[in-house]
Amino acid sequence: MANDCKCPNGCSCPNCANGGCQCGDKCECKKQSCHGCGEQCKCGSHGSSCHGSCGCGDKCECK
């Protein structure tokens, strides 16, 4: 289960739900619109639209 996508070395993945990076990669979650940040940043299980923007692993609200 993808949590905050942080590897032991502090790497964090830009696409959390998909494990978008591997440990040792330099990558980080960016604040962006909800639908662009993986399953963890979607509205329910469909994620068609959200209020505002959120980071990877954040929950967002349905419009």
Swiss-Prot record:
sequence repeats sit at 23-30, 56-63
A GO BP annotation: cellular response to copper ion
Is the keyword Repeat assigned to this protein? yes
Q: What is a single molecular function from GO for this protein?
A: copper ion binding
Source domain of life is Eukaryota
| Induction, per UniProt | Both MT-I and MT-II genes are regulated by copper ion in a concentration-dependent fashion, and both are inducible by silver but not by cadmium salts.
Per the UniProt entry, the signal peptide is: none
Keywords (alphabetical) are:
Copper, Metal-binding, Metal-thiolate cluster, Repeat
Q: Which family does it belong to?
A: Belongs to the metallothionein superfamily. Type 9 family.
- Function, as annotated: The metallothioneins are involved in the cellular sequestration of toxic metal ions.
The entry's other comment says: MT-I might bind approximately 11-12 mol eq of Cu(+).
Q: What is this protein called?
A: Metallothionein-1
Q: What is the lineage of its organism?
A: Eukaryota, Fungi, Dikarya, Ascomycota, Saccharomycotina
**What gene is this protein translated from?**
MT-I
